[in-house]
Each structure stands twice: as C-alpha cells, then as structure tokens.
C-alpha cells in the first residue's frame, strides 16, 4: 500500500508518518518511510540544492529539480518496495509540486501534470492525507516565541520556507483545490487538532478503506 502525506511546512506530516509507521509495524507489516525530496543519494543531493538559501533558482528550474528527485526515488526505491509488498509512507509526493510550483509559483498546471506523470511513472497513492493548516498557524508552530513578520526572514529557515505568507496562502489554496477535486484519494484533516486526534482519523480512514492492513500479522519490519 502506498500512502502519502501532504500539507504546508509545519502542518505535522512528519509526526503523523512516525505515528502510523509505529502502528503498522506493531501489526507485523513491512514499512518503508521516505520523504521528498530525498530517499536516494542523488535525491538527497538535489534536496540540499533546493533548500540552500544561497541558491537563486528559477521556478521552472525548481520544478525540474523536484521532478528529477522524484524520478530517482520512484524508480529506485518506491516501486521495488511496493513490488515486495511493503507499505510505503511518503512525506510529500506530486501533490506538493502542484501546490507549491503550480499554485504557489504560478507555473502552468497542465505542464506540471505532464511532468508529475513522467517523474512518478504514473504511480498514484492509494490514500493521500492532506493536513490542512493556515500559513499563520504553521509559522507560529515553528516560531512560537517570534513575531510572524520576523519568522519568514529568520536565518533558521531554508530557501522554500522563506517564500512568505502570500506564497504559502496560494499553496494552501492549491492543496484545498486538489483535495476537493480528488475526494476519493485525498483525505483532508484539520491540522489544528492534537496529534493523537489526527492519528485516530488517519487510522479510521485506513480501517474503512483497507481494514485488512491493520490486522495483526507475524513479525514486522521497519525499512
């Protein structure tokens, strides 16, 4: 099973990936957890380029770098893992490209869909959990002791995180549009809820769609 997690930075995706991984392993499943960009040596190198503050990258260059990272990850790691019947949990996938580079940067959505299809080898998640959070709340989480205007320019932020409030508002709107257009795949969850409450909603969704996944099996392997 292939499960992806989406949302703006600070929405709590990584926390939910860890919580679900722990649950699935306790049920005896082989679980592989990954992030985008990353997951292979080449993809991690691309991640460093994309997040480095000193790098002035054009929107189309950014798009193609994300696509290159994804192509490496899908072909070298995700597809082989799924073929071996592992459950793959991925922090970000092509919905991030549509939301960030499409709605956020203003690139042509039809072009993005073509590139996403090529880079992902037409692989589609079984379920995508979109954790919905306002940009203001996201930055408050990251910088609870700082004012919002200062936070977007803080030296601790990476290149993507410095894109600003208006950018992240467009990204959030993009995510909401994607979720509304694909309700069978994308499950929207209020990210202002407590982590345990979000986790319960995630497990309830999996139970309703793939209940057999949470049945106890022998063993359990974390990849």
UniProtKB/Swiss-Prot annotation:
Top enzyme category: transferase
Family annotation (PANTHER family): THYMIDYLATE KINASE (PTHR10344), UMP-CMP KINASE 2, MITOCHONDRIAL (PTHR10344:SF4)
Source organism phylogeny: Bacteria, Pseudomonadati, Chlorobiota, Chlorobiia, Chlorobiales
HAMAP family in UniProt: Thymidylate_kinase (MF_00165)
Origin species: Prosthecochloris aestuarii (strain DSM 271 / SK 413)
Family stated for the protein in its record: Belongs to the thymidylate kinase family.
GO molecular function terms attached to this record: ATP binding; dTMP kinase activity
Catalytic activity: dTMP + ATP = dTDP + ADP
Name used for this protein in its record: Thymidylate kinase
Highest taxon above the source species: Bacteria
Residues the entry annotates as binding ATP: 7-14
Keyword Nucleotide-binding appears in the UniProt entry: yes
A GO BP entry: dTDP biosynthetic process
Keywords, sorted A to Z: ATP-binding, Kinase, Nucleotide biosynthesis, Nucleotide-binding, Transferase
Stated role: Phosphorylation of dTMP to form dTDP in both de novo and salvage pathways of dTTP synthesis.
GO cellular component term, pick one: cytosol
EC number: 2.7.4.9
SUPFAM superfamilies attached to this UniProt entry: P-loop containing nucleoside triphosphate hydrolases
